[in-house]
Protein backbone atom coordinates (compact mmCIF):
# COMPACT_ATOMS: atom_id res chain seq x y z
CA UNK A 1 0.00 0.00 0.00
CA UNK A 2 1.35 3.44 -0.86
CA UNK A 3 2.16 5.50 2.21
CA UNK A 4 1.15 9.07 2.88
CA UNK A 5 4.14 11.32 2.36
CA UNK A 6 5.22 14.85 3.18
CA UNK A 7 6.81 16.73 0.31
CA UNK A 8 7.95 20.28 1.07
CA UNK A 9 9.23 21.69 -2.21
CA UNK A 10 10.56 25.00 -3.42
CA UNK A 11 9.98 25.47 -7.15
CA UNK A 12 10.70 28.29 -9.54
CA UNK A 13 9.62 28.44 -13.16
CA UNK A 14 10.75 30.95 -15.74
CA UNK A 15 8.65 31.44 -18.87
CA UNK A 16 9.91 33.03 -22.06
CA UNK A 17 7.50 33.51 -24.95
CA UNK A 18 7.50 35.28 -28.31
CA UNK A 19 3.77 35.43 -27.90
CA UNK A 20 1.29 37.73 -26.27
CA UNK A 21 -1.24 35.07 -25.36
CA UNK A 22 -4.75 35.69 -26.62
CA UNK A 23 -7.44 33.27 -25.51
CA UNK A 24 -5.93 29.82 -24.97
CA UNK A 25 -3.86 29.54 -28.13
CA UNK A 26 -0.85 31.68 -29.03
CA UNK A 27 -2.19 33.86 -31.84
CA UNK A 28 -0.54 37.29 -31.54
CA UNK A 29 3.22 36.69 -31.86
CA UNK A 30 6.00 39.08 -32.74
CA UNK A 31 6.65 37.46 -36.13
CA UNK A 32 3.53 37.81 -38.27
CA UNK A 33 2.23 38.57 -41.75
CA UNK A 34 -1.02 40.46 -42.42
CA UNK A 35 -2.75 40.86 -45.79
CA UNK A 36 -5.85 43.00 -45.19
CA UNK A 37 -6.91 42.91 -48.82
CA UNK A 38 -7.37 39.12 -48.76
CA UNK A 39 -8.28 38.91 -45.05
CA UNK A 40 -5.23 36.73 -44.41
CA UNK A 41 -2.99 36.52 -41.35
CA UNK A 42 -0.05 34.20 -40.68
CA UNK A 43 2.26 33.94 -37.68
CA UNK A 44 5.14 31.98 -36.19
CA UNK A 45 6.16 31.98 -32.54
CA UNK A 46 7.51 29.92 -29.69
CA UNK A 47 8.00 29.68 -25.95
CA UNK A 48 10.19 28.01 -23.35
CA UNK A 49 9.63 27.01 -19.71
CA UNK A 50 12.60 26.33 -17.43
CA UNK A 51 12.03 24.96 -13.91
CA UNK A 52 14.20 24.65 -10.80
CA UNK A 53 13.03 22.58 -7.82
CA UNK A 54 14.36 21.53 -4.42
CA UNK A 55 12.56 18.68 -2.62
CA UNK A 56 13.17 18.17 1.07
CA UNK A 57 11.76 15.02 2.68
CA UNK A 58 13.18 11.80 4.03
CA UNK A 59 10.23 9.76 2.79
CA UNK A 60 10.15 10.73 -0.86
CA UNK A 61 13.15 9.90 -3.07
CA UNK A 62 12.71 12.64 -5.67
CA UNK A 63 15.45 14.31 -7.68
CA UNK A 64 16.02 18.01 -7.07
CA UNK A 65 17.47 19.98 -9.94
CA UNK A 66 16.66 22.04 -13.02
CA UNK A 67 15.10 21.18 -16.36
CA UNK A 68 13.77 22.68 -19.57
CA UNK A 69 10.28 21.35 -19.02
CA UNK A 70 8.63 22.79 -22.12
CA UNK A 71 9.82 24.35 -25.36
CA UNK A 72 7.49 24.92 -28.30
CA UNK A 73 7.26 26.22 -31.82
CA UNK A 74 3.85 27.16 -33.16
CA UNK A 75 2.31 28.59 -36.31
CA UNK A 76 -1.14 29.88 -37.16
CA UNK A 77 -3.05 30.92 -40.26
CA UNK A 78 -6.28 32.93 -40.37
CA UNK A 79 -8.20 33.21 -43.63
CA UNK A 80 -11.54 34.89 -43.21
CA UNK A 81 -13.48 32.81 -40.69
CA UNK A 82 -11.08 29.86 -40.93
CA UNK A 83 -8.34 29.51 -38.30
CA UNK A 84 -5.60 26.84 -38.49
CA UNK A 85 -3.17 26.27 -35.62
CA UNK A 86 -0.18 23.95 -35.12
CA UNK A 87 1.92 23.63 -31.97
CA UNK A 88 4.86 21.26 -31.42
CA UNK A 89 6.83 20.67 -28.22
CA UNK A 90 10.49 19.88 -27.50
CA UNK A 91 10.46 19.79 -23.70
CA UNK A 92 12.74 17.38 -21.83
CA UNK A 93 14.68 16.82 -25.05
CA UNK A 94 11.82 14.96 -26.75
CA UNK A 95 9.60 15.90 -29.68
CA UNK A 96 5.86 15.80 -29.02
CA UNK A 97 2.78 16.82 -30.94
CA UNK A 98 0.68 19.39 -29.10
CA UNK A 99 -2.24 21.19 -30.75
CA UNK A 100 -3.02 20.68 -34.43
CA UNK A 101 -6.50 21.77 -35.55
CA UNK A 102 -8.70 23.81 -37.85
CA UNK A 103 -11.54 25.99 -36.57
CA UNK A 104 -14.34 27.68 -38.51
CA UNK A 105 -16.60 30.39 -37.11
CA UNK A 106 -19.79 30.10 -39.14
CA UNK A 107 -22.20 32.42 -37.35
CA UNK A 108 -21.77 35.54 -35.25
CA UNK A 109 -24.63 37.64 -33.87
CA UNK A 110 -25.69 39.56 -30.79
CA UNK A 111 -27.14 36.30 -29.45
CA UNK A 112 -23.83 34.46 -29.59
CA UNK A 113 -21.07 32.89 -31.66
CA UNK A 114 -21.14 29.42 -33.24
CA UNK A 115 -18.03 27.56 -34.37
CA UNK A 116 -16.78 24.08 -35.23
CA UNK A 117 -13.34 22.67 -34.58
CA UNK A 118 -11.56 19.49 -35.71
CA UNK A 119 -8.10 18.06 -35.15
CA UNK A 120 -5.90 17.24 -32.17
CA UNK A 121 -6.54 19.35 -29.06
CA UNK A 122 -7.86 19.22 -25.49
CA UNK A 123 -11.17 17.50 -24.88
CA UNK A 124 -13.60 20.10 -23.46
CA UNK A 125 -14.50 18.58 -20.09
CA UNK A 126 -12.23 20.29 -17.55
CA UNK A 127 -11.53 23.92 -16.62
CA UNK A 128 -8.00 23.08 -15.48
CA UNK A 129 -6.96 21.01 -18.50
CA UNK A 130 -8.49 23.50 -20.96
CA UNK A 131 -6.35 26.34 -19.57
CA UNK A 132 -3.12 26.93 -21.46
CA UNK A 133 0.00 26.34 -19.38
CA UNK A 134 1.09 29.93 -20.09
CA UNK A 135 -2.23 31.26 -18.77
CA UNK A 136 -2.16 29.07 -15.67
CA UNK A 137 -1.46 30.87 -12.38
CA UNK A 138 0.52 27.94 -10.96
CA UNK A 139 3.60 26.13 -12.24
CA UNK A 140 1.65 22.90 -12.69
CA UNK A 141 -1.95 21.79 -12.81
CA UNK A 142 -3.39 19.97 -9.77
CA UNK A 143 -2.66 16.25 -9.67
CA UNK A 144 -6.34 15.31 -9.64
CA UNK A 145 -6.82 16.94 -13.06
CA UNK A 146 -3.75 15.20 -14.45
CA UNK A 147 -5.02 11.83 -13.23
CA UNK A 148 -8.77 11.92 -13.89
CA UNK A 149 -9.33 14.45 -16.67
CA UNK A 150 -8.50 13.89 -20.34
CA UNK A 151 -5.78 15.75 -22.20
CA UNK A 152 -5.47 16.15 -25.96
CA UNK A 153 -7.29 13.80 -28.31
CA UNK A 154 -8.18 13.56 -31.98
CA UNK A 155 -11.75 14.66 -32.58
CA UNK A 156 -14.29 17.31 -33.53
CA UNK A 157 -16.43 19.73 -31.49
CA UNK A 158 -19.22 22.26 -31.83
CA UNK A 159 -19.16 25.34 -29.60
CA UNK A 160 -21.63 28.12 -28.80
CA UNK A 161 -20.96 30.98 -26.42
CA UNK A 162 -22.21 34.42 -25.48
CA UNK A 163 -22.03 36.66 -22.44
CA UNK A 164 -23.99 34.36 -20.13
CA UNK A 165 -23.83 30.85 -21.63
CA UNK A 166 -21.16 28.50 -22.93
CA UNK A 167 -21.52 25.06 -24.51
CA UNK A 168 -18.65 23.03 -25.98
CA UNK A 169 -19.11 19.36 -26.88
CA UNK A 170 -17.72 16.76 -29.26
CA UNK A 171 -16.53 13.25 -30.04
CA UNK A 172 -12.93 12.00 -29.83
CA UNK A 173 -10.93 8.88 -30.63
CA UNK A 174 -9.16 6.75 -28.03
CA UNK A 175 -5.70 7.10 -29.64
CA UNK A 176 -4.42 9.67 -32.13
CA UNK A 177 -2.29 7.25 -34.17
CA UNK A 178 -4.46 4.11 -33.94
CA UNK A 179 -1.54 2.53 -32.04
CA UNK A 180 -3.47 0.01 -29.92
CA UNK A 181 -1.81 -3.42 -29.88
CA UNK A 182 -4.93 -5.31 -30.93
CA UNK A 183 -8.58 -4.58 -31.64
CA UNK A 184 -10.22 -1.41 -32.85
CA UNK A 185 -10.22 2.02 -31.27
CA UNK A 186 -12.57 3.23 -28.61
CA UNK A 187 -14.02 6.72 -28.39
CA UNK A 188 -15.14 9.38 -25.95
CA UNK A 189 -17.94 11.94 -25.79
CA UNK A 190 -16.89 15.10 -23.94
CA UNK A 191 -18.58 18.37 -23.11
CA UNK A 192 -18.41 21.43 -20.87
CA UNK A 193 -21.39 23.66 -20.14
CA UNK A 194 -21.35 26.96 -18.22
CA UNK A 195 -23.80 29.52 -16.88
CA UNK A 196 -22.53 32.99 -16.02
CA UNK A 197 -25.17 34.94 -14.02
CA UNK A 198 -22.70 37.83 -13.69
CA UNK A 199 -20.25 38.64 -16.46
CA UNK A 200 -19.15 42.23 -17.07
CA UNK A 201 -15.88 44.11 -17.34
CA UNK A 202 -15.30 43.98 -13.58
CA UNK A 203 -16.85 40.78 -12.20
CA UNK A 204 -17.46 37.28 -13.54
CA UNK A 205 -19.35 34.58 -11.62
CA UNK A 206 -19.54 31.22 -13.35
CA UNK A 207 -20.99 27.79 -12.57
CA UNK A 208 -20.86 24.74 -14.76
CA UNK A 209 -19.92 21.13 -15.26
CA UNK A 210 -17.95 18.88 -17.53
CA UNK A 211 -19.13 15.41 -18.56
CA UNK A 212 -17.26 12.64 -20.32
CA UNK A 213 -18.13 9.11 -21.40
CA UNK A 214 -15.28 6.88 -22.58
CA UNK A 215 -15.47 3.53 -24.36
CA UNK A 216 -12.24 1.49 -24.29
CA UNK A 217 -11.88 -1.13 -27.02
CA UNK A 218 -8.27 -1.66 -28.10
CA UNK A 219 -6.00 -3.75 -25.90
CA UNK A 220 -3.71 -6.76 -25.91
CA UNK A 221 -4.34 -10.44 -26.60
CA UNK A 222 -4.53 -12.03 -23.16
CA UNK A 223 -5.10 -15.70 -23.97
CA UNK A 224 -7.17 -17.77 -26.38
CA UNK A 225 -7.94 -14.68 -28.45
CA UNK A 226 -9.42 -12.70 -25.54
CA UNK A 227 -8.69 -8.98 -25.71
CA UNK A 228 -7.64 -7.50 -22.38
CA UNK A 229 -8.25 -3.78 -22.05
CA UNK A 230 -6.55 -1.61 -19.46
CA UNK A 231 -6.78 1.93 -18.14
CA UNK A 232 -3.65 3.48 -16.64
CA UNK A 233 -4.34 6.34 -14.21
CA UNK A 234 -1.41 8.43 -12.96
CA UNK A 235 -0.25 11.90 -11.94
CA UNK A 236 2.99 13.53 -10.89
CA UNK A 237 3.55 15.35 -7.61
CA UNK A 238 2.58 18.71 -9.14
CA UNK A 239 6.12 19.33 -10.30
CA UNK A 240 7.84 18.98 -13.68
CA UNK A 241 11.50 18.73 -12.65
CA UNK A 242 10.90 15.17 -11.42
CA UNK A 243 7.72 13.91 -13.07
CA UNK A 244 7.62 10.52 -11.36
CA UNK A 245 4.15 9.03 -11.03
CA UNK A 246 5.10 6.11 -8.77
CA UNK A 247 3.32 7.65 -5.78
CA UNK A 248 0.03 8.28 -7.61
CA UNK A 249 -0.75 5.58 -10.16
CA UNK A 250 -2.77 2.44 -10.78
CA UNK A 251 -3.84 0.12 -13.57
CA UNK A 252 -7.45 -0.92 -14.06
CA UNK A 253 -7.40 -4.20 -16.01
CA UNK A 254 -10.50 -5.05 -18.04
CA UNK A 255 -11.67 -1.40 -17.99
CA UNK A 256 -14.40 -0.99 -20.59
CA UNK A 257 -16.57 2.07 -19.89
CA UNK A 258 -15.78 5.19 -17.87
CA UNK A 259 -17.90 8.16 -16.84
CA UNK A 260 -16.49 11.40 -15.44
CA UNK A 261 -18.35 14.41 -14.03
CA UNK A 262 -16.55 17.64 -13.11
CA UNK A 263 -18.68 20.41 -11.54
CA UNK A 264 -16.81 23.72 -11.38
CA UNK A 265 -17.07 27.34 -10.28
CA UNK A 266 -15.18 30.55 -11.00
CA UNK A 267 -15.28 34.03 -9.47
CA UNK A 268 -13.20 36.88 -10.84
CA UNK A 269 -12.97 40.53 -9.91
CA UNK A 270 -10.33 43.08 -10.86
CA UNK A 271 -8.00 42.00 -8.05
CA UNK A 272 -9.22 38.60 -6.83
CA UNK A 273 -10.05 35.23 -8.33
CA UNK A 274 -11.31 31.97 -6.87
CA UNK A 275 -12.05 28.80 -8.78
CA UNK A 276 -12.34 25.08 -8.24
CA UNK A 277 -13.48 21.70 -9.52
CA UNK A 278 -14.62 18.40 -8.06
CA UNK A 279 -13.88 15.39 -10.26
CA UNK A 280 -15.62 12.01 -9.91
CA UNK A 281 -14.84 9.05 -12.17
CA UNK A 282 -16.38 5.58 -12.29
CA UNK A 283 -14.87 2.81 -14.39
CA UNK A 284 -16.87 -0.29 -15.34
CA UNK A 285 -15.08 -3.48 -16.40
CA UNK A 286 -15.89 -6.34 -18.73
CA UNK A 287 -14.19 -9.57 -19.83
CA UNK A 288 -15.02 -12.81 -21.63
CA UNK A 289 -15.50 -14.98 -18.53
CA UNK A 290 -16.78 -17.99 -20.44
CA UNK A 291 -13.71 -18.26 -22.68
CA UNK A 292 -11.29 -17.70 -19.80
CA UNK A 293 -13.12 -20.30 -17.71
CA UNK A 294 -12.97 -22.88 -20.49
CA UNK A 295 -9.25 -22.27 -21.08
CA UNK A 296 -8.40 -23.36 -17.52
CA UNK A 297 -10.40 -26.61 -17.65
CA UNK A 298 -8.32 -29.77 -17.33
CA UNK A 299 -5.80 -28.28 -14.95
CA UNK A 300 -4.96 -29.92 -11.62
CA UNK A 301 -6.85 -27.25 -9.66
CA UNK A 302 -9.26 -25.97 -12.29
CA UNK A 303 -12.67 -24.54 -11.51
CA UNK A 304 -15.56 -26.84 -12.38
CA UNK A 305 -18.16 -24.20 -13.28
CA UNK A 306 -18.12 -20.62 -14.55
CA UNK A 307 -19.93 -19.26 -11.48
CA UNK A 308 -17.19 -20.59 -9.22
CA UNK A 309 -14.53 -19.14 -11.51
CA UNK A 310 -16.21 -15.71 -11.33
CA UNK A 311 -16.37 -15.87 -7.53
CA UNK A 312 -12.63 -16.51 -7.40
CA UNK A 313 -11.80 -13.81 -9.95
CA UNK A 314 -14.09 -11.00 -8.90
CA UNK A 315 -14.58 -7.97 -11.08
CA UNK A 316 -16.27 -4.79 -9.89
CA UNK A 317 -16.36 -1.09 -10.90
CA UNK A 318 -13.75 1.31 -9.54
CA UNK A 319 -14.49 4.83 -8.28
CA UNK A 320 -11.87 7.58 -8.00
CA UNK A 321 -12.30 11.24 -7.12
CA UNK A 322 -10.71 14.47 -5.96
CA UNK A 323 -10.84 18.21 -6.32
CA UNK A 324 -9.08 21.51 -5.90
CA UNK A 325 -9.68 25.17 -5.05
CA UNK A 326 -7.41 27.99 -6.20
CA UNK A 327 -7.21 31.60 -5.05
CA UNK A 328 -5.32 34.60 -6.38
CA UNK A 329 -4.79 38.22 -5.34
CA UNK A 330 -3.28 40.75 -7.74
CA UNK A 331 -0.87 42.94 -5.77
CA UNK A 332 0.34 45.01 -8.73
CA UNK A 333 -0.65 45.29 -12.36
CA UNK A 334 -3.81 45.67 -14.37
CA UNK A 335 -7.02 43.83 -13.57
CA UNK A 336 -7.62 40.10 -14.04
CA UNK A 337 -9.40 39.38 -17.31
CA UNK A 338 -11.79 36.68 -18.53
CA UNK A 339 -12.02 34.82 -21.85
CA UNK A 340 -15.60 34.30 -23.08
CA UNK A 341 -14.56 32.06 -25.98
CA UNK A 342 -13.06 29.44 -23.67
CA UNK A 343 -14.91 30.17 -20.41
CA UNK A 344 -11.59 30.60 -18.61
CA UNK A 345 -9.59 33.05 -16.55
CA UNK A 346 -6.77 34.60 -18.57
CA UNK A 347 -3.17 34.70 -17.43
CA UNK A 348 -1.25 37.58 -15.87
CA UNK A 349 1.00 39.20 -18.47
CA UNK A 350 1.19 42.91 -17.69
CA UNK A 351 4.51 44.66 -17.16
CA UNK A 352 5.29 44.69 -13.44
CA UNK A 353 2.38 42.39 -12.58
CA UNK A 354 2.69 40.70 -9.18
CA UNK A 355 0.22 38.20 -7.72
CA UNK A 356 -0.08 35.97 -4.68
CA UNK A 357 -1.77 32.58 -5.23
CA UNK A 358 -2.78 29.61 -3.09
CA UNK A 359 -4.20 26.17 -3.85
CA UNK A 360 -5.48 23.15 -1.99
CA UNK A 361 -5.95 19.91 -3.91
CA UNK A 362 -6.73 16.30 -3.06
CA UNK A 363 -6.38 13.24 -5.27
CA UNK A 364 -7.88 9.85 -4.37
CA UNK A 365 -6.97 6.93 -6.62
CA UNK A 366 -7.84 4.36 -3.94
CA UNK A 367 -10.94 2.15 -3.92
CA UNK A 368 -10.60 -0.58 -1.26
CA UNK A 369 -13.31 -3.18 -0.67
CA UNK A 370 -14.61 -3.25 2.91
CA UNK A 371 -12.90 -5.97 4.92
CA UNK A 372 -9.86 -6.32 2.66
CA UNK A 373 -6.43 -6.36 4.28
CA UNK A 374 -3.05 -5.44 2.80
CA UNK A 375 -0.04 -7.72 3.29
CA UNK A 376 3.12 -5.64 2.99
CA UNK A 377 5.39 -8.63 2.30
CA UNK A 378 3.37 -9.69 -0.75
CA UNK A 379 2.34 -6.13 -1.65
CA UNK A 380 -1.24 -7.18 -2.38
CA UNK A 381 -4.74 -7.10 -0.90
CA UNK A 382 -6.62 -10.11 0.45
CA UNK A 383 -10.42 -10.21 0.84
CA UNK A 384 -12.41 -10.67 4.05
CA UNK A 385 -9.35 -10.33 6.27
CA UNK A 386 -7.94 -13.73 5.23
CA UNK A 387 -4.62 -14.47 3.51
CA UNK A 388 -5.78 -17.05 0.96
CA UNK A 389 -5.08 -17.75 -2.71
CA UNK A 390 -8.72 -17.33 -3.75
CA UNK A 391 -10.76 -15.28 -4.23
CA UNK A 392 -8.63 -12.46 -5.58
CA UNK A 393 -9.18 -9.01 -4.11
CA UNK A 394 -10.72 -6.37 -6.36
CA UNK A 395 -9.29 -3.47 -4.32
CA UNK A 396 -7.34 -0.71 -6.06
CA UNK A 397 -4.74 1.40 -4.26
CA UNK A 398 -3.33 4.06 -6.53
CA UNK A 399 -2.51 6.42 -3.69
CA UNK A 400 -4.07 9.43 -1.99
CA UNK A 401 -2.52 12.89 -1.90
CA UNK A 402 -3.40 16.17 -0.18
CA UNK A 403 -1.44 19.20 -1.33
CA UNK A 404 -1.23 22.85 -0.27
CA UNK A 405 0.60 25.28 -2.56
CA UNK A 406 1.58 28.92 -1.99
CA UNK A 407 2.94 30.93 -4.90
CA UNK A 408 4.23 34.34 -5.92
CA UNK A 409 4.28 35.27 -9.61
CA UNK A 410 5.93 38.25 -11.30
CA UNK A 411 5.52 39.34 -14.90
CA UNK A 412 8.36 41.39 -16.42
CA UNK A 413 6.23 41.95 -19.51
CA UNK A 414 3.84 39.99 -21.71
CA UNK A 415 6.70 37.74 -22.87
CA UNK A 416 8.68 36.97 -19.70
CA UNK A 417 7.30 35.67 -16.40
CA UNK A 418 8.79 34.09 -13.27
CA UNK A 419 6.78 31.94 -10.83
CA UNK A 420 7.80 30.71 -7.38
CA UNK A 421 6.00 28.08 -5.28
CA UNK A 422 6.27 26.33 -1.95
Functional labels for PLM-detected ranges:
Residues 1-8:
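Bacterial N-terminal signal peptides that target proteins for export
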Residues 31-56, 60-201, 205-217, 319-320, ...:
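Outer membrane beta-barrel
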Residues 8-15:
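Bacterial N-terminal signal peptides
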Residues 18-23:
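Sec/Tat signal peptide C-region and signal peptidase I cleavage site
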Residues 129-132, 219-224, 289, 370-371:
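Short aromatic-enriched loop/helix-cap "lid" or pocket-rim segments at secondary-structure transitions
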Residues 59-60, 228, 232-422:
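Outer-membrane beta-barrel pore domains
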Residues 24-28, 34, 189-190, 216-252:
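Surface-exposed, low-hydrophobicity segments enriched in Gly/Pro/acidic/Ser residues
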